[in-house]
Amino acid sequence: MDYQADIIIVGGGIVGCATAYHLTRSGADVLLLERNGIGSGATGRSGGGVRQSARVSEEIPLAMDSVALFPSLSDELGVDIEYVQAGNLRLVETLDYRRPTQVDIARQQSHGLDISWLDSADVLELVPPLRQQNIVGASYCAQDGHCNPFRLVTGFFNKATQGGARVLLNCEVQNIVQTDSGQAIVETPSHTVRAPIVILATGFGSQALCYRIGYDLPLANVRYESMITEPLPPLFQQMFGVASSDLFFRQTCNGGVHFGGGILEEAGQEDTRTTDSNLHLAVAHISRLVTDLEKARLLRTWGGLDPSTPDGMPIIDFLNENVLLASGFCGHGLATGPIVGRYLAQWVLEEARPDALGAFNRDRFDGWLQTKWTPSGSFAAVLATEDTQIAGSDTVGEGIAFMTPPKFEDSDERGGQQKLAINPQMCTGCRMCEVACSIENEQAVSQTQLRIQVVYPSDDFFLPIVCIHCEEMHCLKACKHDAMEVNEHGAVAV
């Protein structure tokens, strides 16, 4: 069957449904295509966090604008999204992470975010069920919170359909073809759909679909795992993260403690099954943090896939005159979805990119990264470092936990252990330097997992990155913010 629309949206997650909602409010003829069911991808499998904190600098203003919408969304959408704005604490378990977290707080404050450092006593006063002996402190953003992802996405979806949006579920897009008439033809197994504008909000299917239509983008699917316990008495209202890993946890409105995400795996296939080893690690980790939680029964577990980019920010840009991509939200797109949907609708209706989306253009990956980025290997090299950041340290001092032997047996060959000098006023924390090194030196990094120190001279802050002390200075070439210090010879300062 053939269909015609003003705008086709591919993807029934938070970005796709929010965009459909805002477009129909303006009277646009919208057709939404979803290969499974609404919220069946990353949105419905997410942790439910609604946060501005712990983001790269360019994304903070977007997150702040989006979080400002949440208090009124239940009324606007006509459904209780179970939004709780009680703050987000990013817990610090060891001294290794105290100073880095404090420096990162200062970075976020410089972008207008209300975030502060709490010492152990303050954290425990705010959240008594936490285990005192395992908490050094935390970053705290009181305006952050959490919600029910299913209620949020179905709220936007229902409002969009009430506004006139048409929907084809269980409808997988196979290809998108441009025509001389200015229309795009979207091909599915059962339908052919035409529209001048196609918005791809396709989540974990984005990289493969973009590749089929001629665009090889640095999007790699990462698999997250989640669990939820039986309903428990009230423990806390806040959303929690952990500085040393991607573990999150929150207590839902029905009392279950939803946690997971601490184990990240690159997903070469679309497999959302959970693994016993990962589940045991996550359970052990949260049990060290929360009193008596190890006694709670688990009700269910699930996995999810979400595309990530090298710099931790989404790609929101036109691929050609017909196709607008919004993908690569790196596991934290639920909070920004409502505002991204509004801005995407504004973009296609007014034919001008909103200033708020300027940082997310695909051109930032031109050059070396666009040709060298592959999901296999590069992500594994970066993610594999997560488990070694504390494990290799036998020190309790600040700022020296990441010392490792140089790659070369003769320590004088490269002057011993090297330290890269970073300008803290310019660095945004995007980790492009780390990713560049892991890509360019993929085999050596995956074998050795060696590190150097990145030093913020003004703050005595040591940030670990993956490196094998190469002469090519891939990290310097990858830095988009002129944050890396150079010496009089133009080499990276050490």
What is each of the regions a protein language model found here?
Residues 48-126, 246, 277, 285-287:
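Dinucleotide-binding Rossmann-like beta1-alpha1 core, especially the glycine-rich loop
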Residues 81-90, 104, 117-120, 124-163, ...:
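Helix-loop-beta segment of a Rossmann-like dinucleotide-binding subdomain
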Residues 192-236:
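Central helical "cap/lid" subdomain
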Residues 399, 405-408, 432-453, 472-494:
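Iron-sulfur cluster-binding cysteine motifs and their immediate structural context
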Residues 139-194:
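Helical element adjacent to the flavin cofactor pocket in flavoenzyme catalytic cores
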Residues 24-43:
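Glycine-rich FAD pyrophosphate-binding loop
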Residues 231-325:
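Active-site lid/adjacent beta-loop-alpha segment flanking the redox-cofactor pocket in flavoenzymes
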Residues 149, 288-383:
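C-terminal catalytic lobe of FAD-dependent flavoproteins
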